[in-house]
Amino acid sequence: MNWDDMRVFLAVARAEGLTAAAPVLKMDPATLGRRVARLEAAIGAALFVKSPQGYALTDLGVQMRDRAAEAEAAFSLAI
């Protein structure tokens, strides 16, 4: 996972969906969906439960969100 993957993951997790995350990242929702799918394939596990109502984090997704948010905060303090 690289920094861009983490930013996409965090934005989708925080927005609870692709459509809401798209303007934050200035990306198309379909592109975000492909990025999330690629990340999940690389990890070998689902990070989100997808439904028409949005994206909800799986247990692994919650753990990853917490760690990614910690890394994001540490990075922000360092610069």
Show where each model-derived region lies.
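A short LG(V/I)-centered, amphipathic sequence patch enriched
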Residues: 40-57
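The DNA-contacting recognition helix of HTH DNA-binding domains
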Residues: 3, 29-30
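The N-cap/first-turn positions of alpha helices
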Residues: 2-5, 61, 68
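Alpha-helical linker/hinge and terminal dimerization helices associated
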Residues: 42-43, 64-79
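Residues within the DNA-recognition helix of helix-turn-helix
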Residues: 28, 35
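Short helix-boundary/capping micro-motifs
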Residues: 11-26
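Short alpha-helical "packing" element that flanks the helix-turn-helix/winged-helix DNA-binding module
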Residues: 5-12, 64
